[in-house]
Regions:
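Low-complexity, PEST-like segments
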Residues: 1-122, 139
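Short alpha-helical "recognition helix" segments of helix-turn-helix
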Residues: 50, 124-133
Length: 158
C-alpha cells in the first residue's frame, strides 16, 4: 500500500472512531444534563466517562496491526528466552504515545490468547479487529474535546 492510500485509510479509520465516540458522548452528555448538571461540568464528565467506559471497535489498519503485534510478540519471546532485550518498548522506537502503546498491548494480548488456541497470527488479528471491542477509547480528553467542538482545537478542557 502506498503512502497516499495509507493516509486515506488512516483518515477513514479516525473518522469511524470519532463517529463512534461522538454517538456515545452525546448520549452520556444528555444523561448528565437531565440530572441537572451544569453544561460545562457535564461536558467534562461526559468526555471522561465516555473515554473510560466506552467499548469501541479497534479502528486500526490490518497491516499496521500485523507489524505491531508481531513486534510485540517477538519482544515478548526474547524476554522469555532470557536473551538480551531492550528495557522497554520505547527503547526500540515503538509507539511513544502512552495511550496508543496501551492499545497495541491490549490487541497483542488478545491475539496471543487466540494464537495459543491454534489460530494463525493473521486470523487472530482479523478476529480481534473485526469482532472484539476495546476496553476504552484510547484518546486523551483534550483530543476528545477537539472532536466534540472543532472550534476548540486550541483550547483544552477547562
Amino acid at each position: 500500500m502506498n503512502d497516499m492510500q495509507s493516509q486515506i485509510e488512516h483518515r477513514e479509520l479516525c473518522q469511524r472512531r470519532d463517529k463512534e465516540f461522538l454517538a456515545l458522548y452525546h448520549a452520556t452528555l444528555d444523561a448528565f444534563l437531565e440530572r441537572g448538571m451544569d453544561h460545562r461540568q457535564a461536558r467534562r464528565a461526559a468526555v471522561e466517562f465516555t473515554i473510560a467506559n466506552g467499548h469501541p471497535h479497534y479502528h486500526v489498519n490490518h497491516e499496521r496491526a500485523y507489524r505491531c503485534v508481531c513486534h510485540l510478540l517477538n519482544s515478548e519471546q526474547k524476554r522469555g528466552n532470557g536473551s538480551r532485550t531492550y528495557r522497554n518498548i520505547e527503547d526500540k522506537g515503538f509507539a511513544k504515545n502512552r495511550l496508543r502503546r496501551l492499545m497495541w498491548l491490549e490487541i497483542t494480548q488478545r491475539v496471543g490468547v487466540l494464537t495459543k488456541r491454534g489460530l494463525s497470527i493473521e486470523k487472530a488479528i482479523d478476529h480481534v479487529l473485526e469482532h472484539c471491542r476495546a476496553s476504552r477509547f484510547f484518546i486523551s480528553p483534550t483530543t476528545a474535546l477537539t472532536k466534540i467542538c472543532p472550534a476548540s482545537r486550541t483550547r483544552a478542557l477547562r
